[in-house]
């Protein structure tokens, strides 16, 4: 394989605040795989001596490029395609399954214990429910490391999946498999349907037999996105919910103050799919243009949660989040664009902080990893070239682009430390789909890339296989989408990295905070008298440990009973809004 150029240092100018920092993401190696058609990689499995990349390939181009297998079965859709490579990204083998595949709703892979066997989940056309394989439904397989099928199962309804066609999954606590998708009808395998779109989960044992199934929904439109095993037993589910359906179904009502917006929803299930609790988060404005949703929720060591997804709005749980206003194609009064969104909750599911990241175009986050220092590493995508996305400058991303992969790092309070776009010059043309964390510094990413036709436009893309995937008979250059795998290393020196502050008026610069360090009390002296000044003391886990409101020019915070360490002191009134570090000795 070909080793790419190493990016040992990237200087990022953070536009919000004008703070210059050093962000060092090194691309250690990368490679691309595909045929002459479109290949969509959606997942991977990493083993000691091989890697499986899983997604789908264009049926009409099977047998071209690296797609050496012919998957032309009679069923419609693009087949699931698996590429087996070594850790130098050299090809070992590849194979496909023609009975499983449609758009990007195929090929999610899950390792089964310590066996070299795997579950695959996706969508296909199984012959179930007397529908004669006419509609898309859930398909699950169990395979070995050589692609041999141990069993295949299909589940669903006669009417088939809802519009998004995506069927995903998660390993069950008992070694089986959970499959989930969204449906607009009931019957057959689905025992309950509440109306207008529900999420459905079916649990299989290791032999592919159904253990249990459950529907999550209301009379409104409810969409299920992700299921995660809980370390406390049962499962955590992320959804979006429409509160118009609050009065019917198995989900507790969202707040009546959020009457028209799609809201982020977390649902806790027990081991057999019964709802234990659910919690809603989102906007409070009576405007259907505002909304939010979660792609992932993780449990943290302190008992709390971190959620990542996307959001657009400025009220409710999004108030003060820093959402960047934007509209689709910059059309005045057009549809609002989303930011990547992180929501930090305590053990009782109360909001600790809510932060948005992005620019004036669409930005998303789908994967978050807690760091040992309390911060978070986040992976997603961006179409923006402004706002927080200062690194778009190194790709010269156009206002209208095809998306760049985006990775950014925060501290424990959600403050952005650095960010990095990874893609091609001009149009980006890269999408992250799956990430495996090796440690706090190293990650393997699987995704999709459109190989550049010229080194001038390649940017971060440096695959030696691109020529193999180009169709020579295509008058437009044959630059189709391909599987993409890359290994990156975070080389930032966090001992010298400073948290960026928002721009401050000149009068804020003379706010006095003393003594600092302190072993008991910290005093605050403002430049002018204020009727109401709020102070919050926040620990490095992002928790507010003390609050106080005062009038006048000065006051103090007691810290003598707090553990020694670094804290963030946030001060806000009509003239002042700033955060400063305070050391408790």
Where are the regions that the model predicts?
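Bacterial Sec-dependent N-terminal signal peptides
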Residues: 1-27, 499, 577-579
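Intrinsically disordered, low-complexity regions enriched for glutamine and histidine
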Residues: 3, 20-22, 435, 541, ...
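Residue-level detector of intrinsically disordered/flexible regions characterized by low predicted structural confidence
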Residues: 4-7, 86, 143-146, 252, ...
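Serine/threonine-rich, low-complexity intrinsically disordered segments
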Residues: 5, 10, 22, 70, ...
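N-terminal processing/targeting junctions
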Residues: 15-16, 20, 60, 89, ...
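A sequence-level/structural motif corresponding to short, flexible coil/turn segments enriched
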Residues: 22-503
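C-terminal outer-membrane/trafficking sorting elements
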Residues: 503-514, 518-585
